[in-house]
Design a protein with these regions (language model features):
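Short, glycine-/small-residue-rich phosphate/pyrophosphate-handling segment
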Residues: 115-141
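N-terminal beta1-alpha1-beta2 submodule of the flavodoxin-like/Rossmannoid cofactor-binding fold
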Residues: 1-117
Length: 141
């Protein structure tokens, strides 16, 4: 099994993110001892969000079902889409995830949505996903 773990937030790989990795990795290893885990930090890559070129929507086109924009995450998007699981760790800023993580998710997920009378997905597989977040709030809030 290959599992990708993403972390977004501050550029520095701080103690909160290190604790996230330890917590998530221990949980994965408890369930799947031989899991291959690839960690990545979104700020280690130079990329932008979707640019609305619609290359991913052109049926029978070379980019149909995948992002056609070429940059640092082009190959990574393919790898992540074939993973057997994904764990995303992120702080919450201004009631949402950081923009860099949002951009990655746009580029990863939007190509799989097909427009028609009904929306459906052409994703290569269903992927178990976990999202671990932190925010500056108490449990009561």
């Amino acid at each position: 099994m290959t599992c990708f773990m993403h972390s977004a937030g501050v550029r520095e790989k701080n103690i909160i993110q290190i604790n996230f990795w330890i917590f998530a990795l221990n949980g994965i290893r408890d369930i799947i001892p031989d899991a291959k885990v690839k960690k990545l930090y979104v700020y280690d890559y130079n990329y932008t969000g979707c640019i609305s070129c619609y290359a991913c929507k052109r049926m029978n086109g070379k980019s149909c079902g995948k992002c056609g924009k070429k940059d640092d995450i082009s190959g990574l998007l393919f790898e992540v889409s074939r993973a057997e699981g994904i764990v995303i760790g992120s702080p919450v800023y201004f009631h949402d995830i950081p923009g860099q993580l949002r951009s990655l998710m746009e580029r990863l997920l939007y190509p799989y949505l097909v427009y028609g009378k009904e929306y459906y997905s052409i994703a290569p597989c269903k992927m178990p996903t976990a999202f671990i977040y932190t925010m500056n709030a108490t449990e009561e809030k």
